[in-house]
């Protein structure tokens, strides 16, 4: 329910857009005449898109903190992120071309997206995250996979017959970075708190989220290293131990696409610069 165009529509009054404002209060607030909070056949979840409030990074963090706080004010309410592709204009220092137009098959856009996913999970506390769109014919940063005719980087909008019968398939690093989350973090898993994270400073360094599968005693840690230096961490589990003190890394970088590596010790987990790494292990 909701499908808000951006997170701020969920928690505040939008100038000149009363019909889009304060959607959490409207649908689930105790004082709302339109509240559906007590309808047993409606899932107690509000949804919104991750667009627009992603740059500068300080706004990305602040908006996620605000929507998380608002969701927590309604007992039992959860938040889904239901649509995102690159549409902002952060400049060429962040992504090739500086904005959404102009597809990017490389790691810069992949890290841009992975940062948003990580912060949506860790800061906004979303319980579901979706991308727009799977396959794109356009010269735009909207596809996990792109198709083209070999002569250009994509069609002009409206050309429905572009690559209709033949063409080339191009995978993106965004596809693989997305897989660092989606291949390993599954429904029913529980997110594990990582204490003492400064989300703002982490956003240009290393962002961490962790999850556990209680039934199978499985542990997953996803690290997004936005920085230019290798970072090393020691994994300490509160109330448990890492089986055999080891985890298997899966790395997406400029030279790797979800590449499985050799087992690493839990007391020396290394995250290469400009990479997304998923560590998978078991716990006792």
Q: Which residues does each predicted region cover?
A:
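Aromatic/acidic polysaccharide-binding cleft in carbohydrate-active enzymes
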Residues: 78-183, 192-201
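Active-site proximal loops enriched in glycine and acidic residues that flank catalytic Cys/His/Asp
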Residues: 3, 50, 83-86, 130-133, ...
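Solvent-exposed beta-hairpin/edge-strand motifs
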Residues: 238-257
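Glycine-centered loop/turn motifs
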Residues: 186-192, 244-245, 266
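C-terminal beta-strand-rich structural cap/linker in extracellular carbohydrate-active enzymes
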Residues: 262-284
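Noncatalytic carbohydrate-binding groove/subsite architecture in carbohydrate-active enzymes
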Residues: 1-116, 123
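Carbohydrate-binding surface patches
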Residues: 199-242, 274
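Composition- and surface-driven signal marking solvent-exposed, interaction-prone regions
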Residues: 59-67, 94, 144, 193, ...
